[in-house]
Structure formats: structure tokens, C-alpha cells
Amino acid sequence: MEITFLGTSSGVPTRTRNVSSVALRLPQRKEIWLFDCGEATQHQLLRSDLRTSQIRRIFITHMHGDHIFGLMGLLASCGLAGTVSQIDVYGPPTLDRYIASCLRWSVMRLPYKLQVHTVEPGEVFSDGEFTVTCRLLHHRVPAFGYRVTEGDRPGRFHVEKAQALGIPFGPLYGQLKQGKTITLEDGRTFDGRDFCDPPQRGRSMVYCTDTVFCDSAVELAQQADVLIHEATFSHQEANLAFARLHSTSTMAAQVAAFAQVKLLFLTHFSARYAPGNPVQVEDLLAEAQAIFPNTRLAQDFLHYAIPRDGQICAEMPPSDSPAAANIDTLEATLEPLEAQTVAADAKNAPAIAINRATRQQMQQKLGIDATTANAILERRRQQKFTCLGELERLYPQVDWSALNVLF
């Protein structure tokens, strides 16, 4: 199970991020499953090492344009590229009418069979090897989160042990591999479980966007190997998240923590956090890691292979986690989301988290000019601050004694 992010921006594309789409490559089947298909997804596929001829299933979360406007172009291109295998598309109730209208008014004829499935909470697809389930999330329109679960694989069969005991090669080995008990002609019986290692747990991936924090996302993501969750807003803009029914970075982290997932990828970032703006996606990462340390930032064309051992893939470079000295326990951080509020006037707040503060926050709370704030930001990017004495030595113009500085 190999994940490739094709679009990680929300609403509109930016210079470095396209709108939503994630590819799940299944090498053993030579198949690609897509999750959402925002505008220009087929362009992203051309820039990747993925082959459109291997696309077999497309799962649409909801009917907003930044998640579906690339679908029809991709389906048409698959046909022009010579695809003849059936493509199955899954999504909300209005998806079939949308596709039918586009096919009709563009006079598009596909050379392959296109099957559209209307999803409901529960099992969406299963073939014995993989099972896809979905849950209804909490957004302005019906939106579904998807979970792909791989079936458990039998443990290694120790053929040398069977040979040493004189068990004849043939169909009996197949029965032993399945854990069955066999009886030989000489009357000896053998339990197949004695010849096999424990089964290998199947891997799982969960994709949740668009949604505000909700219990169904937590239930869907229970103990998943990878959770891909939207983080449209920073924590300081939680009021916007609640108003627009999107998630903050901390909401995504809370879902990951409650669900006890192995690894969280943040995606679906607002364009307001693009390079050059006061708040960066790295600030959202720091917010999330304070709650759930095993958090990574998704970026276009980032590739991640889910390992079979349930551990975080060694190929992923470690990310610096912000110091969380102010957090005694995980439970202390996971307060009820309904009770969270955003300070109306941030400059009156008594504390500043120096390793996560934005330039505007530093200007307001520290009473410094933009040049000094940028200098602190630049030094922080190179090496995070660890003590108050270091700040007092580097920036004596700030009255640090009047502030409650958190690291």
C-alpha cells in the first residue's frame, strides 16, 4: 500500500499545492485507487510516476468543486489513453447525476465500462483482500470519510519442519498453511498452526476531508496505520473552522490521538498559509505535534509506503516536535472542542508559546517591530529556543520578565 499525495491545498490551488487528490497504489494488484479528484489531478498524475491505465477505483468524499472538478477530464483521458478495464467511482447520492450530465452535455463516450456507486455509511467495497468502509462526516454538504483495510495475511509456513516429519508434499501442505488439522495414512495427526508463524496484520489507511472534528472520524480511524486528515485552519482560527465546518490542525491531531493511529498526515491547507504569509504550514505542524507527535505535513508528490510491521516507515525523515512543557498529560490537551474559544484580542493574552508563535503574535505580545519579529522567526527556524536566558541575551529590547514564555 503506497500513498502519493497529488493535491494538498483547500479551495484553490497555490503555486506549490494543487487541490485535493490522493492516490493509493496497490503494486500486488497493479491498481491505483484515487481519493478525490480536484481540478488538474490528471496533470499531477502526468508529473508523477503513476500510470493512469492502472486506475480502477475513485472514491469521492463530497461534491464541492475542489474535490471533483478534475474527475470528468481524467475519465475522458483514461479513455483516450486506451483504458478498457472497468472503472468504479464511489461517492455521495448526487455524484451519478453529475457524471451523467457531464457525459451527456459534452457528448462524451467512454470506451470502457464506468460504474457509479452511491455510498452509504458502512461497507463500500470488499473482495476478500481489501475492504473499504465509509462514515458520514460533519460538513456543509454530505461528506464521507473512507477507510481501506487490508486483510490479514497468513504467517510463514515452515516447509522444512513438515518435511522433517515426513509429511508428503502436496495438497496436505496447503491444508497446513490454512491452519487445518491433517491425518496421515499412518494415523499421525498434525495441527497446521504448529507449522505457521502468527498471521500478519493487514494495513489500513483512512482519509477524512472535509469535516470539522466529529466522533465518526474518530470511529473510522481507530488504530489505523495512516490517517490523512484535513487541517484547513490553524488553531488560532478555530472560530473560522467551526463556522465553515472545517478542521484545525489541533482537531486533526485530536482525532489521531483519540483513535490511536500510528501516523497522521495533515493536508487540505488554506491558501492563507502559503509561503510568504505570516502563518506557515510549519506552524500548523507544530500545533498538531504538541498533541500528537507522530504528525507529518503532506505535500504534493510526497510518497509514503505503509510498512507491514505497523511501525512508522524509516524512509520518512523525523520532524522536530515542539517542546510541550506546558502539557502535563495528553488528556489535558484533549479538552472538549465545543468549549474551545479564540481570544478576541490576542495581545492581552498572558502567555506566548515562542516556538509556535507567528510574526503577528510576536509583534503584538512582545511589543516589537516587524524587523525584530522576523529576526526571531529566522533564528527559530534554524534552531528552536530552549530557555528564557537565551532570549534575554539575544533580544534585550524585549521586557521578557513581564511575559509568561512557553517553550
Curated annotation (Swiss-Prot):
Reaction catalysed by this enzyme: Endonucleolytic cleavage of RNA, removing extra 3' nucleotides from tRNA precursor, generating 3' termini of tRNAs. A 3'-hydroxy group is left at the tRNA terminus and a 5'-phosphoryl group is left at the trailer molecule
Cofactor requirement: Zn(2+)
Record: residues binding Zn(2+) 1: 62, 64, 139, 210
Chain positions covered by the region annotation Ribonuclease Z: 1-308
Cofactor note: Binds 2 Zn(2+) ions.
SUPFAM superfamilies: Metallo-hydrolase/oxidoreductase (SSF56281), RuvA domain 2-like (SSF47781)
Keywords assigned by UniProt, alphabetized: Endonuclease, Hydrolase, Metal-binding, Nuclease, tRNA processing, Zinc
Function: Zinc phosphodiesterase, which displays some tRNA 3'-processing endonuclease activity. Probably involved in tRNA maturation, by removing a 3'-trailer from precursor tRNA.
Protein name in UniProt: Ribonuclease Z
Gene: rnz
